[in-house]
């Protein structure tokens, strides 16, 4: 069951509203932009965008459907040959409404409705790609840090236990031993890295 739109009609009767929207759409496609009241611009926007979508299909049936609304054949030709190809990649949003100051005579709110001329640039979903990249490096960096902390605590605990039991002269000797132990552990590590580089070359 057809139901009327909410709010007052443009012009009073349904036929007058259809004529107003038809004339506004014709002028919009002919000139590219028109200045009218905000309420007329808001009513024209979905009407004009449906006509552009039909023009994008470009077949005979849709041309006849557009000719029911826009009676000027030269404007329909312009719509199908010039305007519709510019919106081929754009999925919708062919028009833009910009509010301007009120009209001087009766203070009616005015607006400019125009066809969008900028090239369509689809936005890429950047948030989904950035999140996995940020989480991947984090575990790799934490693992070596925990190993070095564990080695340092083991080295620090060993001298403190020896100093409690030994005399001050012996503590000097025990402090030198961990340094020698660290040097001894570094030499095998260096040898293992040399062996791994030789294996990589082979």
Swiss-Prot record:
GO BP annotations listed: translation
Region of interest called Disordered, as start-end residue ranges on this chain: 130-202
The keyword Ligase is annotated on this UniProt entry: no
Any one Pfam family match given in the protein's UniProt record, by short name: Ribosomal_L17
Protein family (similarity comment): Belongs to the bacterial ribosomal protein bL17 family.
Low complexity compositional bias, start-end: 130-142
Name of the protein described by the UniProt record: Large ribosomal subunit protein bL17
GO CC annotations, alphabetized: cytosolic large ribosomal subunit
InterPro entries: Ribosomal_bL17, Ribosomal_bL17_CS, Ribosomal_bL17_sf
Organism lineage: Bacteria, Bacillati, Actinomycetota, Actinomycetes, Propionibacteriales
Subunit field text: Part of the 50S ribosomal subunit. Contacts protein L32.
GO MF, any single term: structural constituent of ribosome
